[in-house]
Amino acid sequence: MEVELNYVVNHLEKLGPASFCDTPYSFSLSDSNAELGALSLKVDEILKTNYNLINPEDVTDSDNNEFALKDLTWLQNCCNEISQSSSTELDASVLFEAVIMSLKATEDQCAIQEDLLNLVGLDHIDLISDIVANSSNLIEEYMNQNDTSIAAQLSDGYTSEAGSSATHGQGLLDSLKSRPRRFSRSRDNRGPLFTGQQVFEVEKYPHVYGDKRLGNTISVIGKKFALPAGSEREDYQKYEEIIVPHAQRAPQMQGEKLLEISSMDILCRKTFLSYQTLNRIQSLVYPIAYKTNENMLICAPTGAGKTDVALLAMLQTISNYVESMNLMDESEPLDVHRDDFKIVYIAPMKALAAEVVEKMGKRLAWLGLKTRELTGDMQLTKTEIAETQILVTTPEKWDVVTRKSVGDTQLAEKVRLVIIDEVHMLHDERGAVIESLVARTQRLVETSQQMIRIVGLSATLPNYLDVADFLGVNRYKGLFYFSSAFRPCPIEQHFIGAKGSPKIVNSNIDEACFDKVLKLIQEGHQVMIFVHSRKETINSAKKLREQFFHEGEADLLDNSQHEKYSLAQRDVSKSKNKELKELFKYSMGIHNAGMLRSDRHLTERLFSMGILKILCCTATLAWGVNLPAYAVLIKGTQLYDPQKGSFVDLGVLDVLQIFGRAGRPQFESSAVAYIITTHDKLSHYISVVTQQSPIESRFTDRLVDNLNAEVSLGTVTNIDEAVSWLGYTYLYIRMRRNPLVYGIAYDELVEDPLLGSKRRELVSVAAGRLADNQMIVYNKKNGYLIPKDLGRIASNYYINYQTVSTLNNLLKSKMSEADIIALLSQCSEFSQIKSRENEHRELESLMENSSPCQLRDSISNTSGKVNVILQSYISRAHVEDFTLTSDTNYVAQNAGRITRALFEIAMSRTWASAFTILSLNKSIDRRQWSFEHPLLQFDLPHDLAVKVENQCGSLSLEELSDMSTGELGDLIHNRKMGPTVKKFISKLPLLNINVDLLPLTKNVLRLVLNITPNFNWDMRYHGNSQMFWIFVEDSNGLEILHHEQLLLNKRNVSTSHLLSFTIPVSNPLPSQLYIIAVSDKWLGAETVTPVSLSNVVFHDDSNPITELLDLQPLPITALHDPVLEGICAKRFSFFNAVQTQFFHTIYHTDTNIFVGAPTGSGKTMAAELATWRALHNYPKSKVVYIAPMKALVKERVKDWGHRLVEPMGISMIELTGDTNPDVKAVTNANIIITTPEKWDGITRSWKSRKYVQDVSLIILDEIHLLGSDRGPVLEMIVSRMNYVASQTNKKVRVLGLSTAVANANDLANWLNIRDGLFNFRHSVRPVPLEIYIDGFPGRAYCPRMMSMNKPAFQAIKTHSPTQPVLIFVSSRRQTRLTAKDLIAFCGLEDNPRRFLYMDEEELEMIVSEVEDKSLKLALPFGIALHHAGLTENDRKISEELFVNNKVQILIATSTLAWGVNTPAHLVIVKGTEYYDAKIGGYKDMDLTDVLQMLGRAGRPQFDNSGVARIFVQDIKKSFYKHFLHSGFPVESYLHKVLDNHLNAEIATGTIDCIQGAMDFLTCTYFYRRVHQNPVYYGADGDDQKSIDTYLSKLVVTAFNELEKSACIYRVNEETYAPTTLGRIVSYYYLFHTTIRNFVQKITENAEFDLALQLLAEASEFDDLAIRHNEDLINIEINKSLKYSAACLNLPMVDAHVKAFILTQAHMARLKLPVDDYVTDTSTVLDQVIRIIQSYIDVSAELGYSHVCLQYISLMQCLKQACYPSEIYRASLPGLNASSEKEARDYLNKFAGNKTDELYQMLCNDPNVFDIESLVNSLISYPKMNIEVSQSSSDKLLLYLRRLNQPLNPDFYIFAPLFPKPQSEGFFVLIIDSETQELFAIRRASFAGRRNDDSIRLSLRISMDIPPTCRNRNVKVMVVCDGYPLIYEHKIVLMI
């Protein structure tokens, strides 16, 4: 016995200290540990023979009698003895409880033996027999006694931590799951032979079938002590064979039956169309897989039908998105919401992915679902991904997709099911990827609060419970384990180990292979032989053939007697594969990926027909093709792995997959599988195939890189989150179960059961390594982890941190291709590649003939070899050696990815070496050097390619493109090919670039690029899109000043593209810059545009800064007015420093003033001081306050109305598009608060409006908006008011309020300011402000915005954990998305409602009043939303809750910064871009908007300082750093819209000639700026002559445009006069292009649809908001409209199309799909009435009566929200009229009656369903009497008398669906009765009160009769503009 045990011990000792030592350590991960499996038989024999280990079948009654007297006292004594011995550290009481628990857990005595063996070791193995034999007696006695008292007898001094030994006894069993036992080398102190994890499970799980874990094959430590029962061992001279018999089929369980497909719903029935029933496993899994959403782990043998289980899970997910009344009824239609979900199937290999795509695609095609492969070989476009519901991918590819923060976030958001196939590859090197994916998915589920189901498919696992826990599977529901007994065709497994030295082992493998194949063929079976290279398939087949002949068994290979032999022979004869033809004669075939597809299919067909008996193939056949055989044989297990640069063992995945091909259930009841390996690997394969070793984690191998991925993604932002993240990995599961494997001592696990310290140690070390490599910023004090560009790039391109370390040292700003290739060669990705002596000769040849770049290292080194083979690959050199070919492919695959990473790193460092790196990257992709001719990238015939290279190489592409086809033909000496060459030249993607330079300041330049594609698009070569890089390079070629990406597609290739950006320029100014446009994929497709800076004039705008003086704060008593002091005293007692400084100038002088100061510094007080002075000194004058936005107007009206109006006894009025006060109210007002456009429109008629002439003070708030598109209006207002003042001799004081600007001098000069200029620094604030600018990478907007949410949450926790926070976003959608993510982050906090400060009762009451769903969801978490899409009440609730500190966070659009004064301690500007449909992309916000947002940071009455965080795109950080502190120069926008404003002045008579216009311009701000910065505006120089020429040209162009629009006409050579159209344009405040378009397209008989079209085409809708993807919404709405938007001939993304659609949607009363469209509809309806009125006037001018009536009808329809055919029914809400006639009859009958009478008449009417609405509409309907008379030949008199009272004093019509109240109005038309020509038109309205404030019910109208219509028969029509009301009177006009 000692000798045999020593054999075992000595054999184990040979494995080394890593697997066998005195210290606690495990060898579970060691490859050599697998040899334990081979010793299992030996150990069994030793234990049984010498240790009397009992087999339960051998225990007899007499044996039991011998032990009958053993009781608990005996057991107690035994435990005491064991505890006192030195072989265990266990306390007696603990050991006693563990033994009892083991006895209670199972009746399986073999299992009890193994448990006790682990507990007490081999030293006490004799006691085990006694305990096992007396187990029933011991348990019975134990159950009858008090276990606590028994335990107390064992050890007086022992007390468990839990307070009871019983509890600790159970705890011991649990702890033993992860506590290894020591193995001592001392014979005198022997412990158990086997160490490792104890997986002692007492629970019985409902779906574990055939688990032998507690039987005699699997031990409590998760490893087998012995091979399965019945295993045999055969020892031959040349090899050893272990035969594992196939498992017996699992017997049918009670009640078990196969599930019939016919009993399922339609989804399953049609998907499993060819099935009658599911198989056993599928039937058992079905209730959970299809009926629930549980996570699942299905462990079952290969070939058991797991793929169909995955399909069931897919169908369950799909069913959640299917609309059907009854899924059991096939006649019911199915509507699948395909865009709402994604399913991801993760396959271990690309070949399997392709197979899954084919299978799933066919099965689910009937549902219209698309299945696509997304792997390294199969890339998908964004559109393809959007169209795909089921993505089949590999772990690495899905890792790449999900780790990109700027990836397709919508893809990740829509994933609802992740299926992981072959999850047992966790133990493989690639297992770390699976762990990373599962952890990321589970954390995404938690943060997003959206369920993502995870389904794992696996072969049978020894520790499947660990994997189930890792996948988040409920053990009692989603865990399914099926032993090999459930395999459809049980497999007998043969493990053969070839003996001998390395020189002869291959020969012995051949011998063993032949022996087994011969036996199988003799038995009449087919066999598939798997080898590991294409070449070996042929060699093995030929070797076998020779052996058959040598042994005289060649007759067995004769297949000529097969019935289909002749047909097969004919097919084979057509093949060009010589080996295939030759081997076919001997019933042998070959199959590998190097064969033609037709030959592979032929081989598969012949084998399936049985004609081929032997098939030699590679593993690709096992993965890619379902071709089973009775027997499979793996010949050899060594294959070349280029990633490691050496031969490695065949992976268990491949072995199991190949073994899975054994067996054809339809033909045989069993199968056989062989694996032939070397003898030293035999035990390894026995272990892994028979599941003897538990699956361990390999996550630590990739921990550093995976941590970097999570930090870069933004899901891990500090060490605590990293520790939490590690808790989701399989590593964490296994560290707790088997700690010693991972270097964790038992005591450490006891003290820290959750391993928090160990996890913190692991992530801290990993974070330190990342920080050392400049990949992240690691703040060790607070644990923050902040990603850096280098880390993001490494994560996105799957670059490991060792390579990054190399790059940090070797990457330079200037590098040649040779330098870059040398750098690539040293990357760690290639460190495993070895240089072998047998390759040197070929490498030398390749270096000499195919390596144009000089080598830095010897080919005997790894880097030298990589260098050569990479260059050879680019040169398309042929490589002979097999391993060298594999290495070349591996290097090529990785080099492209690494060079892309290098390119981005170089760009992030602004290094010009980026160009060279990009060029090399394209060379690798194209396999062509940059010095070769670009045309070679096309598929040129070989002879033509040679001629192009030889003849065209010296000519540039520009020269070639200028040549004719004939010249090109002559050049290449082949005239026929001239057109071909010309065609290819035209397809090379090149760009033309025109550059405009716009100096902003003395060191900042704006470049505007007009880019025009200069090539012909060909889908074959260009695909769907082409990417270009636009670089701005300095004159030295060393630095990239700026870079942009430009994406072209076939749709926009024919249009020009504008790019605008700013760059810093150095001092002294460089002579030129280079604009370089480079194709992302095409070599030689480069355009270099030099830009000279010699003519650029940078004016030094000396910015006058007003220093803040050290003054004593001025008390409010300085006002010397008790009323004003009382107003101020409610808020403060002293003016602040800024107010103190400007107080005297504003309050005691009449000089014009400019106050430039940051938001929040008290500028409003300047307006109040000036107002008080104006009203005091000029009491009859008016003050006009002009704010740029309606929101600001409303804020000012609310503020001053509350504070000033009543105390001062003054009146104030609001003038905006939302309010229309009558003239009397405006005339009586002291203060007018209005918008620029409204005041501009009013002052255009200043001569007829006395209140305009009475203005003494005009306040221009936010005057820095001069530079915006609305700025010209401000210029015109100031210029016009100055003109009015000069005409009336009344001075108008101007006060301009602004943020600090960089060119305040120009503003002061324009405003005629001398002593009143106050331009304070940005830092001058009552509350100091800290500003942080954070850059975020990525070009895609939405993913970038999403990546900002986690940093925003962290910023709140850092800067303002309890104080108010204001988050500004760019759109309404972003408010919702941001709130959603913040809520998810709150959910992960200890207190999810940390931002809420009100009780539940108050919250419920408030939420009940909220309408918006997103706001309802956000408020309970202390987050409010604010945007224009909310109702007024919702906005008010959000504002009040935030101001009153009931909620801490307010997420708002940028308009809130202007509109509502809601300061906060912390302001986060989340993105500085917004979507602009005009450019079809995202545009930067005005800097003034950003400054306004920042101004909301800091609360003067609460905060000592404020904090602002600006989140911007990384490339824009420098821009904001510069201008946020220096101020942005204010430029003019007037030159872009000069024509419209000149038209207004011409219409009013202010201008009548070009010189007058020139003189008028001198009064504008534009005139001053064009002299200061002429190049910015397009002047040729900075001298006066150039500027005058520019201005003259500008004015002449404007006049010409107005003439084209018929707005002006030339009176004589110099003088111009306005036309009626020009006056209409001015009066209605329209663009002249609107009227031009109308006049050009309108026809006399135009119908309603054309009227609607021309309305939508108005230029006023040019700026209607278009958001991302709204074209898709437009398409859907358009389908429901009466008139299609196709009539506009514009793309669906166009603003005019949207206006057309919204206008109709309003009339059709459609429910709009998004809230944004509701607000947009209001915006459109704000404009339409004004435009329609102008169209009516123009139509009247043209004499088109029909058109006038059409537009009046359109106006009625818009107000009543209906089409013309529904106008009567729409005008009578509450009436269910069946026709228009019926509605009209009601109207004629009931309109104008009194309210009481109507209620009485209609109360019982069955057609009335809403009597209140109906009555309101009827009583508001005007009932009139009209009299027409002619007082003279040129006058027509009309008398209109209203017979009923209006609904209200303002004569508002009943139009509940129109957004604003509409007053009742009428059109009076005089129309020729015969020709229908319109002679005259007049508006009339009863609205407007009399002087005595009574309402007016009668009108007298006098109309001029044109001479042309006298003595004509005319009809006078009075048409209501809001109701379908027409009065007609015919009259013959007198002469």
From Swiss-Prot:
One of its GO terms (molecular function) is ATP binding. Keywords: ATP-binding, Cytoplasm, Helicase, Hydrolase, Meiosis, Nucleotide-binding, Repeat. Residues 513-723, 1351-1546 form the Helicase C-terminal domain. It is found in: Cytoplasm. One of its GO terms (cellular component) is RQC-trigger complex. SUPFAM superfamilies: E set domains (SSF81296), P-loop containing nucleoside triphosphate hydrolases (SSF52540), Sec63 N-terminal domain-like (SSF158702), Winged helix' DNA-binding domain (SSF46785). ATP binds at residues 300-307, 1157-1164. The keyword Transmembrane helix does not apply. The keyword Nucleotide-binding applies. Residues 287-479, 1144-1319 form the Helicase ATP-binding domain. Its EC number is 3.6.4.13. Gene3D superfamilies: 5' to 3' exonuclease, C-terminal subdomain, C2 domain, P-loop containing nucleotide triphosphate hydrolases, Sec63 N-terminal domain-like domain, Winged helix-like DNA-binding domain superfamily/Winged helix DNA-binding domain. Residues 787-1093, 1618-1934 form the SEC63 domain. One of its GO terms (biological process) is rescue of stalled ribosome. A motif (DEIH box) lies at residues 1261-1264. Pfam families: DEAD (PF00270), Helicase_C (PF00271), Sec63 (PF02889), SNRNP200_wHTH (PF23445). A motif (DEVH box) lies at residues 421-424. It comes from the Eukaryota. Component of the RQT (ribosome quality control trigger) complex. Involved in activation of the ribosome quality control (RQC) pathway, a pathway that degrades nascent peptide chains during problematic translation. Drives the splitting of stalled ribosomes that are polyubiquitinated, as part of the ribosome quality control trigger (RQT) complex. Has a role in meiosis. Belongs to the helicase family. SKI2 subfamily. Composed of two similar domains. This is RQC trigger complex helicase rqt2. It comes from Schizosaccharomyces pombe (strain 972 / ATCC 24843) (Fission yeast).
